[in-house]
């Protein structure tokens, strides 16, 4: 293509060159896709379906069937422009997918994804071979059956990972187990197809083996360069929250150079670009900048245009009856292959039956590598005609639309199967992924949240299921715009100044604290920013809790400890926000009273073992607090002690301790439940915890016999200096051991015991008050 035509108008009477018409086409796709999305969203349809339909509207089937429109959109040399910009769009979103992919989840579920990929590929291959027997006489193919079989195999077995990623995100399944497994399978299937096809074609041609080796070296070299640049660039401007736009451009230029070089040899660059993204260093300012700068334009502009271009390729005008039959066969074989292969793998892997229909349906979508392979140069193959090409493209588009509609229908009709379930810790197995969300207004709260993350992470390897998230809460003044347009952001990509009323540039200090912790502990904390008015903040937190599917949310207490050891009130608005979250929270809630000077310190980097105590009076909140301590017990830098309080009135009853063997001769107290069922639940849970952790020596166990509330206060004062952190449930009900303690209660949101520990001058430890999930987040009452 003549470079002069890229930016200049053609000579003659034409008003527009292909570049201009392409941009107009992109604008039309965005407009139509928004209209379709508004119409289809109430039905549960994902964005890609609406965007493909927008492309079909502009395709030769509809608007481009009009001669003037066709002449406008499909000009001379237009194919070259479409090819180049398709490459640029593809490079950007494959790199972003690599940056965003959950590596820890993919490692943990590698076997599942690999088995599903293999099973799907094998079944699709067998059905492709059977279909080949039909297509050879149907289309009169007389030579080179193997190449046609390869094209058919890769086309039918492929899954378009960008369509899957975007659909899963629209359905808000990208934080749940099945959603991330679907994304992993889609990536495995697509990358396997690309690698297999490239290798086979290389051996057939015998001309690009050396080039493939050089491309591999170039990809590895860029990965190594990124590993050097990623930590070095932030040091140039340590006071900036993000890298500059010029520095960001450096990474993208390197990426385009590699991609263009590979594509110039007719080799697909998707694998290399994705590998560069997935191997990019995940911690630090550079990764955070790339995610922040690329996410919005790619999700809102690049992907819609790319999906629209898939629909624009749809053309069935020139097809005859036998090719329509071919479309039907391809659609049926594609979906059947995915269903048989994926369901067989699900049976082998013992994946719950409720996901058996959804997985193969969404994995049947096409449109990425399939189209690239169909656009390859088969000019020397006599069987490869424009009609066969249009038939294959039409089949892929129809398959994607059918699969997308069916998947959304399954989600709509079986919504409970995909609902947010792990809302409490009591029934949460420690082998399952623990997702926690810590909220922070400023760097002081962030450091306390990091301490909790450090404690709960235990002595784990990178493959263990633990996902911490930190939400930076920025209260918005009433008269300030709650949302800024993308072009209204500053150079850092954030708000006007990134500040809040707790101090200057809190966001930068929070980032630095998280980066420092990640560097020392190798634990990555995902960051979320919430900018909203204080009166609505509790609702936004609850919405985010459901979207992120966390099991417990940690909120900062509305008071903080000063350097002199005294406490200062940060404001009643923050206290009221905590109360609202406790009232409406869709999962368990913890309020962290951080005495960072005299209390709990971050275990990672701390020289000595810290002593932590959990106080057990009985009831669902205390069981939830004890359940949380199962993760604390796995941390070798923490010595955990369970202190159970038993009323003297229940001493005559059969104590829980009689069912346990223990060497400790201190007084052991019985749980006084509000009813027999509650007592049995407490007893059963405590015995299970005792047998698992106490008998093995991981956790200490003490019984305290008390008569009333004042006696309990005396014991709490005695142990106040012995521990750096107390973990306690919020509510003890009408327990006689806390009677008359409410007379001195200052903060009811902490519960009777938690309020005393947080306000007493005799206690210097930090306090974590836990409330079990009580309400479903369906609606909010005006507080």
UniProtKB/Swiss-Prot annotation:
Organism expressing this protein natively: Arabidopsis thaliana
Transmembrane helix keyword on record: yes
Highest classification ranks of the organism: Eukaryota, Viridiplantae, Streptophyta, Embryophyta, Tracheophyta
Entry keyword set: Antiport, Ion transport, Membrane, Potassium, Potassium transport, Transmembrane, Transmembrane helix, Transport
Tissue distribution of the protein: Specifically expressed in pollen.
Protein name: Cation/H(+) antiporter 2
Topology within the bilayer: Multi-pass membrane protein
Gene Ontology biological process terms, A to Z: potassium ion transport; proton transmembrane transport
Subcellular location, record wording: Membrane
GO CC, alphabetical: membrane
Principal subcellular localisation of the protein: membrane
Family statement drawn from the similarity comment of this UniProt entry: Belongs to the monovalent cation:proton antiporter 2 (CPA2) transporter (TC 2.A.37) family. CHX (TC 2.A.37.4) subfamily.
InterPro entries, per the entry: Cation/H_exchanger_TM, CPA2_transporter, Na+/solute_symporter_sf
Protein task: May operate as a cation/H(+) antiporter.
Top-rank lineage group of the source organism: Eukaryota
Transmembrane segments: 19-39, 43-63, 81-101, 121-141, 145-165, 186-206, 208-228, 242-262, 300-320, 323-343, 355-375, 391-411
Any one Gene Ontology molecular-function term assigned to this protein's record: antiporter activity
């Amino acid at each position: 293509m003549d470079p002069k035509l890229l930016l200049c108008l053609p000579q003659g009477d034409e008003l527009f060159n292909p570049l201009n018409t392409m941009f107009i086409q992109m604008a039309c796709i965005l407009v139509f896709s928004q209209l379709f999305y508004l119409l289809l969203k109430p039905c549960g349809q994902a964005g890609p379906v609406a965007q493909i339909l927008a492309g079909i509207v502009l395709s030769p089937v509809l608007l481009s069937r009009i001669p003037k429109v066709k002449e406008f959109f499909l000009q001379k040399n237009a194919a070259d422009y479409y090819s180049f910009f398709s490459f640029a769009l593809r490079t950007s979103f494959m790199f972003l997918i690599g940056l965003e992919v959950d590596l820890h989840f993919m490692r943990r579920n590698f076997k599942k994804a690999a088995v599903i990929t293999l099973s799907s590929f094998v079944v699709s291959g067998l059905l492709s071979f059977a279909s080949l027997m039909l297509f050879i006489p149907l289309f009169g193919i007389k030579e080179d059956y193997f190449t046609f079989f390869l094209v058919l195999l890769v086309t039918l077995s492929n899954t378009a990972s960008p369509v899957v990623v975007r659909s899963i995100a629209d359905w808000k399944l990208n934080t749940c187990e099945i959603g991330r497994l679907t994304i992993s399978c889609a990536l495995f299937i697509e990358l396997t197809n690309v690698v297999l096809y490239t290798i086979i074609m290389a051996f057939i041609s015998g001309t690009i083996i050396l080039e493939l080796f050089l491309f591999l070296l170039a990809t590895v070299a860029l990965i190594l360069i990124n590993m050097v640049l990623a930590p070095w660039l932030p040091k140039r401007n340590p006071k900036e929250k993000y890298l500059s736009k010029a520095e960001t451009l450096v990474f993208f230029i390197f990426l385009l150079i590699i991609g263009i070089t590979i594509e110039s040899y007719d080799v697909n660059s998707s694998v290399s670009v994705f590998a560069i993204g997935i191997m990019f260093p995940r911690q630090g300012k550079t990764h955070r900048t790339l995610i922040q700068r690329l996410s919005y334009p790619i999700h809102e502009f690049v992907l819609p245009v790319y999906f629209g271009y898939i629909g624009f390729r749809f053309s069935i005008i020139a097809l005859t009856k036998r090719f329509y039959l071919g479309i039907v066969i391809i659609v049926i074989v594609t979906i059947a292959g995915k269903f048989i292969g994926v369901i067989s793998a699900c049976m082998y892997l013992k994946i719950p039956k409720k996901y058996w229909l959804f997985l193969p349906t969404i994995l049947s979508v096409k449109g990425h590598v399939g189209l690239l392979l169909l656009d390859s140069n088969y000019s020397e193959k006599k069987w490869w005609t424009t009609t066969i090409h249009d038939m294959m493209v039409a089949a892929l588009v129809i398959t994607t639309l059918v699969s997308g509609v069916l998947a959304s229908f399954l989600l709509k009709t079986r919504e409970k199967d995909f609902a947010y379930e792990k809302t409490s810790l009591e029934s949460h197995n420690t082998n399952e992924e623990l997702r926690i969300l810590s909220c922070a207004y400023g760097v002081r709260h962030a450091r306390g949240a990091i301490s909790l993350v450090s404690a709960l992470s235990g002595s784990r390897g990178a493959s263990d299921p633990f996902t911490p998230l930190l939400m930076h809460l920025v209260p918005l003044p009433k008269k300030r715009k709650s949302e800024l347009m993308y072009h209204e952001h500053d150079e850092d990509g954030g708000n006007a100044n990134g500040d809040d009323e707790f101090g200057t540039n809190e966001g930068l200090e929070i980032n630095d604290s998280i980066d420092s912790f990640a560097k020392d502990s190798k634990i990555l904390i995902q960051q979320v920013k919430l900018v909203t008015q204080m009166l609505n903040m509790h609702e936004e937190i609850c919405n985010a809790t459901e979207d992120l599917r966390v099991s417990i949310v940690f909120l900062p207490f509305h008071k903080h400890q000063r350097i002199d050891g005294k406490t200062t009130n940060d404001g009643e608005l923050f206290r009221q926000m905590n109360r609202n979250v406790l009232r409406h929270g869709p999962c368990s809630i913890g309020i962290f009273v951080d005495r960072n000077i005299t209390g709990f310190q971050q275990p990672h980097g701390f020289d000595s073992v810290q002593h932590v105590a959990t106080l057990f009076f009985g009831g669902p909140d205390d069981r939830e607090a004890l359940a949380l301590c199962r993760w604390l017990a796995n941390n070798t830098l923490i010595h955990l002690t369970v202190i159970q309080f038993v009323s003297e009135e229940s001493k005559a009853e059969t104590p829980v301790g009689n069912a346990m063997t223990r060497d400790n001769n201190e007084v052991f107290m019985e749980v006084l439940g509000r009813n027999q069922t509650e007592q049995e639940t407490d007893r059963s849970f405590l015995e299970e915890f005792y047998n698992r952790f106490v008998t093995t020596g991981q956790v200490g166990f003490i019984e305290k016999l008390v008569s009333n509330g004042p006696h309990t206060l005396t014991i709490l004062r005695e142990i106040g200096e012995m521990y750096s952190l107390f973990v306690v449930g919020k509510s003890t009900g009408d327990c006689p051991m806390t009677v008359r303690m409410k007379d001195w209660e200052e903060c009811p949101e902490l519960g009777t015991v938690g309020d005393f520990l947080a306000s007493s001058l005799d206690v210097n430890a930090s306090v974590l008050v836990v409330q079990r999930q009580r309400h479903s987040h369906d609606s909010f009452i005006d507080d």
